[in-house]
Every structure is written in C-alpha cells, then in structure tokens.
Amino acid sequence: MSRVVVSVIGQDRTGIVAGISKVLAENNANILDISQTIMDNLFAMIMLVDISNAKVDFATLKKELEKAGEELGVQVIVQHEDIFKYMHRI
C-alpha cells in the first residue's frame, strides 16, 4: 500500500474539504483517515490517503492538490507517509 499525508492550512471558508476530497476522488485515491479542526477562523486538516490505485502518479496528484489549494486560498502539503513520520518523530 502506498500512502501519503495531505495537510491543509488556511483561513476557514466553505468548500475546503469538498475541494480537496474531489481531487482525491477524481484520481481514485482513497481517504483512510481524516482529522480537521477550526481554531479562531484558522482551518487545519490532515488526511492519510491510499494512492495504491490512483489514476496518476504521486507528483501529478501533488500538483493537482496544490492547485486546488491555491484556488481555495489554502496551503496544501503532500508528503509520502514515511517522510512525514520521519519529519515528525519525537
């Protein structure tokens, strides 16, 4: 299984979850876990996504998600799960 972590941060607005999820669904990427919160109008979301059966490669999916983030006015960071874990280990 090939998994990536998608992090989204920015000012809260309608459609962020829908916009990011739409890109994943269109590319046959499966959301395994999702957590999101809003703190004083700041939106933060993290998703664990299985891209094993995705229609596009990692680089293409990353670009599409980043483009969707720009359109939504949020920052999107996409990392392979192992890199994310390495960067956030204690």
Swiss-Prot record:
> Where is the secretion signal located?
none
Matching entries from InterPro entries are given as: ACT-like_dom_sf, ACT_dom, UPF0237/GcvR_regulator, UPF0237_ACT
Domain ACT, first and last residues per copy: 5-79
Q: Which organism is it from?
A: Methanocaldococcus jannaschii (strain ATCC 43067 / DSM 2661 / JAL-1 / JCM 10045 / NBRC 100440) (Methanococcus jannaschii)
Coiled-coil annotated residue ranges, if any: none
Q: Which domain of life is it from?
A: Archaea
Please provide, in alphabetical order, the Gene Ontology terms of the cellular component aspect for this entry. cytosol
Q: Which cysteines are joined by disulfide bonds?
A: none
Q: What biological-process GO terms show up in the record?
A: DNA-templated transcription
- This one is known as UPF0237 protein MJ1558
